[in-house]
Amino acid sequence: RYDRSGSSASFSRAFRMNPLAEAYDEEGNIRSAAWEDSSEAFSVNPLSSLNNKSNDIRSKVITNNVVEIKLPFVPGLSYKLNTGYTYQSSSWKQYQGMDTYYGARSNGILNTDDWHSQEWILENIITYTREFGKHRIFFTGLYSAQSYEKEGNGMEGKDFPNDVMYYYQISKAATMSGSSSYTKQNHIS
């Protein structure tokens, strides 16, 4: 499990920013707009994203297993089983409050994205090796199956009455939209 919460400053906006712009107001707070300009490309303060409330937690479990059996009653015959399993989950939430450039224009913007995935692989390998004088026989047989499945849900809310509850207030949004996705893949060879 690892935590990737927080937002970083925008270096691309810093390169485009007017050098005369002020990133902080008189009280030392980060301004949402560094320059009063009609062009969004030049007016967004590259530091304003530091005011975003962001929560990004991810978890991942991986297991790989191998079993090899050499059959003593048939010289040169062996069986190998390879298995693997991966589970991942992610919970991402970001609230752009009234103190951010985009949040101020929409009375707050909340985005959430939650997903989980699992995948597995199973490989059966039979190998036969035998030497007869100057001759050698080598045979490999493989049967493999694998699966991948991912499910995700996202929400966006805009126009909040206040900034008090950050990303725990989706039901308070005046405008909401949602999305969901599902993917499943199976392979046999």
Show where each model-derived region lies.
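Surface-exposed loop/interface segments of Gram-negative outer-membrane beta-barrel transport/assembly proteins
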Residues: 1-62, 78-187
